[in-house]
């Protein structure tokens, strides 16, 4: 009996429009035009990032090595923002995270805060307002350690974080990276 009552109340609650009140809309236009679909990539156009001899450092690692003019532009940007430049260097075998070059309590990690310490060139350049002073220190460091990685990092003393870091010298003897045009196979 309850099933019959439930069935009749459901059918009463559903309103069915009369056939004559439903009209097809023949002239509907889309509100937004669909973006054209790009042709799918061919299998021979897809590249694979090679993990062998393709190690990266910091901010601009995906780019080809920076020229002197590009490094000078980055130094200008660091100084103009009031950040504190600091030079660091490391031999090739100490530049990457490994059991021999890092002090850690967990597994291997990446980025600056991984307990992988490079040797600091002098002190951070607190209060430096002259980009030429930073460039002179870069030249002095690269002359003193011609076969070492040299990176410039910038710190924000208000936020107390590293803002950026990039290589200014890669050793000529380094064989652990690929030029940008050979990073994929």
Swiss-Prot record:
GO terms for biological process: photorespiration; reductive pentose-phosphate cycle. The keyword Transit peptide applies. Keywords: Calvin cycle, Carbon dioxide fixation, Chloroplast, Methylation, Photorespiration, Photosynthesis, Plastid, Transit peptide. Pfam families: RuBisCO_small (PF00101). Residues 1-45 form a transit peptide. GO terms for cellular component: chloroplast stroma. It comes from the Eukaryota. GO terms for molecular function: ribulose-bisphosphate carboxylase activity. SUPFAM superfamilies: RuBisCO, small subunit. It is found in: Plastid, Chloroplast; Plastid, Chloroplast stroma. The modification N-methylmethionine is found at residue 46. The basic functional RuBisCO is composed of a large chain homodimer in a 'head-to-tail' conformation. In form I RuBisCO this homodimer is arranged in a barrel-like tetramer with the small subunits forming a tetrameric 'cap' on each end of the 'barrel'. Heterohexadecamer of 8 large and 8 small subunits. Belongs to the RuBisCO small chain family. RuBisCO catalyzes two reactions: the carboxylation of D-ribulose 1,5-bisphosphate, the primary event in carbon dioxide fixation, as well as the oxidative fragmentation of the pentose substrate. Both reactions occur simultaneously and in competition at the same active site. Although the small subunit is not catalytic it is essential for maximal activity. This is Ribulose bisphosphate carboxylase small subunit, chloroplastic 2. It comes from Chlamydomonas reinhardtii (Chlamydomonas smithii). The gene is RBCS2.
